[in-house]
Amino acid sequence: MSRKFCVGGNWKMNGDQKSIAEIAKTLSSAALDPNTEVVIGCPAIYLMYARNLLPCELGLAGQNAYKVAKGAFTGEISPAMLKDIGADWVILGHSERRAIFGESDALIAEKAEHALAEGLKVIACIGETLEEREAGKTNEVVARQMCAYAQKIKDWKNVVVAYEPVWAIGTGQTATPDQAQEVHAFLRQWLSDNISKEVSASLRIQYGGSVTAANAKELAKKPDIDGFLVGGASLKPEFVDIINARQ
């Protein structure tokens, strides 16, 4: 089954009106691969501003959302709010949410379940730390994280999984294409064994972790890498080259 390449740009806590306008101008004027789906993860306060400036064919993602529709949850936003201002995606389970804000596998899975029920598409993040990789626990960790999602997600058609080795995020260290492919192949097999062969064949698995224009083409050649979740490079003009990595 052919899976449409999908590239997400996660701006994290970066950007202001001026820089967002510049990024939008770059993306609007660039010849982007029509066979690649592009999603921009923008800080919540700028989502509406970005939606008005970005090309309409680009998806827009919140970087977080809570597990209920409304209520006394100071500082949180809901999937319904994201949809209301024009976002169609949300990034959940990012390693920074797990490590800095203490989000558990169970909470992240509940967030994903609610976001999907509210009609958002979800980029569901997983990945191991350097300590876990060096201990040979990569497969064990990503399987545990996938199990948590699988307990709550029954329909996977609006889910993209993003594998992000935590040790490669923002460090300049990147998993080699072979290292990345090895984990993606394991995830594909895990999906086949634990969900279904159909989901395994159709679900897109992105790679995230210091993706740049320099390494994107080699990573994109791997059979089980279906796109990227890009951090810092998505704020730069080279993001266009990453989007076009399959060309």
From Swiss-Prot:
Q: Which UniProt keywords apply?
A: Gluconeogenesis, Glycolysis, Isomerase
Organism for this UniProt entry: Drosophila melanogaster
The cellular component terms of Gene Ontology attached to this UniProt record, alphabetical and capped at eight, are:
cytosol; M band; Z disc
What family is it from? Belongs to the triosephosphate isomerase family.
Reactions catalysed, semicolon-separated, are: D-glyceraldehyde 3-phosphate = dihydroxyacetone phosphate
Active site at: 94 (electrophile), 164 (proton acceptor)
Q: Which residues bind substrate?
A: 10, 12
Cross-referenced InterPro entries, in alphabetical order? Aldolase_TIM, TIM_sf, TrioseP_Isoase_bac/euk, Triosephosphate_isomerase, Triosephosphate_isomerase_AS
Q: In which pathway does this enzyme or protein participate?
A: Carbohydrate biosynthesis; gluconeogenesis; Carbohydrate degradation; glycolysis; D-glyceraldehyde 3-phosphate from glycerone phosphate: step 1/1
**Which SUPFAM superfamilies does this one have?**
Triosephosphate isomerase (TIM)
State the superkingdom.
Eukaryota
Q: Which residues cross the membrane?
A: none
Q: How does it assemble?
A: Homodimer.
Enzyme Commission code(s) on record: 5.3.1.1
GO MF terms held by the record: protein homodimerization activity; triose-phosphate isomerase activity
Q: What is this protein called?
A: Triosephosphate isomerase
Q: Name one GO biological process term.
A: nervous system process
